[in-house]
């Protein structure tokens, strides 16, 4: 018995990609942006098909992503930012609302929204996840976006 499997590839289908980037903690976020752009280009996306849109911080990212999704001109959206835990509950509010909002936008508009917003306990963890020991989560999010565009195009063609 042969099971039929449908899965996305890492070869970017035609289309434009939006990176919605929170400016807060920019010393980490800019590495995520570089990683995402590099991954997209290496997998076949032209630089002219990548648009970077900057939001003030992670809390504002979901609204910007929603406005971008409403325009229907991007194959996928990659959300990038960094929320670093401090001594107050602020971290939980910002991180939780960001995740919830991005998920809602993806489901509402049927557009892949890749999550590349770091939610970490320390600056050291943020640095590790933006290009050192733990890889670059911006690049990983970009690859997820490519894979989802590929997968959804296959599902829509069936």
Curated annotation (Swiss-Prot):
A biological-process GO annotation: riboflavin biosynthetic process
Enzyme class: transferase
Pathway(s) per entry: Cofactor biosynthesis; riboflavin biosynthesis; riboflavin from 2-hydroxy-3-oxobutyl phosphate and 5-amino-6-(D-ribitylamino)uracil: step 1/2
Any Pfam family the entry gives: DMRL_synthase
Keyword Ribosomal protein appears in the UniProt entry: no
Molecular function terms from GO: 6,7-dimethyl-8-ribityllumazine synthase activity
Lineage: superkingdom: Bacteria
Entry GO CC: cytosol; riboflavin synthase complex
Enzyme Commission code(s) on record: 2.5.1.78
UniProt record similarity statement: Belongs to the DMRL synthase family.
Protein task: Catalyzes the formation of 6,7-dimethyl-8-ribityllumazine by condensation of 5-amino-6-(D-ribitylamino)uracil with 3,4-dihydroxy-2-butanone 4-phosphate. This is the penultimate step in the biosynthesis of riboflavin.
Matching PANTHER family: 6,7-DIMETHYL-8-RIBITYLLUMAZINE SYNTHASE, 6,7-DIMETHYL-8-RIBITYLLUMAZINE SYNTHASE DMRL SYNTHASE LUMAZINE SYNTHASE
Name the record gives this protein: 6,7-dimethyl-8-ribityllumazine synthase 1
């Amino acid at each position: 018995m042969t099971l039929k499997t449908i899965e996305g590839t890492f070869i970017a289908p035609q289309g434009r990609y939006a990176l919605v980037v929170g400016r807060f903690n920019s010393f980490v976020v800019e590495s995520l942006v570089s990683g995402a752009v590099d991954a997209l280009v290496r997998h076949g996306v032209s630089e002219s098909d990548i648009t970077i849109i900057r939001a003030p911080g992670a809390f504002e990212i979901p609204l910007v992503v929603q406005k971008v999704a409403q325009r229907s001109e991007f194959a996928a959206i990659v959300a990038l930012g960094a929320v670093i835990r401090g001594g107050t509950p602020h971290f939980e509010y910002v991180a939780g609302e960001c995740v919830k909002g991005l998920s809602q936008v993806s489901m509402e508009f049927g557009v892949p929204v890749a999550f590349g917003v770091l939610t970490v306990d320390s600056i050291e963890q943020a640095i590790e996840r933006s290009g050192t020991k733990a890889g670059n989560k911006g690049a990983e999010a970009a690859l997820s976006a490519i894979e989802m565009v590929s997968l959804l195009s296959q599902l829509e063609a069936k």
